[in-house]
C-alpha cells in the first residue's frame, strides 16, 4: 500500500509543472496587449507603456517570463491583478468558498438522485423506469449548461417567481463573512431568514451545475450494478433464498459502488469547468465568474493564477479519490 501511495504522490510534480505550462503559455495566446488594457480608453504615452512592460516582465523573452513566473509560484507569489492591484491569491481565497459551496451542493444533489436512480434502474432492467432514467440521463448529459440555466431562469424565476435570478443572497441582508460559506455564516448570524434566502439562491445554480454529474453517476451506477448482479455470488445468494433487498444492500451495492467512486472523482473537474458558466449565468460571485471577468479585461496575472489554483485543486481531489479507490479495491493497489 505504501508503494502505491508513493507512486501516486510522485505524479504530483510533473502534473503540477504541466499545469503551470498550460496556465502560462495558453493564456499568452489571448489576443491583445495587456498594457493597453490597463491604460483603458485614455491611453498612455510610449514611455509609460514601456515602463509598465518592464514592470510586468512583458519585455523579456517568453521562456524567461515563464522562468520568472514559475519561481514566483514556488514562493507562493501569484502576482497582483492588473486591474485591482490586489494579490491574486487573496482574491482567489475570498471567492473560492462561494465556488466550493456551489460545487458541494451540486455533487450532493447528483449523488442523492443519481445513486438511487441508477440502482433502481438496474434492479428493474428494461422497465419503464429504467428507460426513463436512461433517457433523462442522456438528455442531461447532452444539454448545454447555458441553455439549461436560461430555461430554468425563464421558468422558475420569470414565469412563476419562485426563485431568485442571481446572486447568493437578497440585498436586504448583510452577513458578516466568518467562514466564507454563506449557508454556515447565515446560520451563525442573528437573521434566520437570511439562511432561507441563501438556500433559495442556491436552488437553480445547484440544479444546473449538478445535472451533468447526476446523469453520469446514474448511468455509471446502473452499469456497475448490472454487472455485479450478474456475478456468481449474487446467483448463489438468490439460491439461498435471500430477499432482493438483502442481496442488493449487503452484497451487490458495495462492489457496484467501487467504479462509481472513480467517476465521482472525475466529476470534480467537470464541476469546476461547469461552475465557470453557471456562475456567469447566475452572477454567482465565485472563482468561475472571476475568471470570466479576467478574460474580458485581459488580466493576465488573474488568469494565470486562477487557472493554476483551480488545476491544483482538481489535481489534489483526484489524488485523494485515487488513493481512496486503492483502499476500497485491493486489486488496484496490487497491480499498479
Language-model segment annotations:
Residues 9, 48, 52, 62-78, ...:
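Hydrophobic alpha-helical segments of integral membrane proteins
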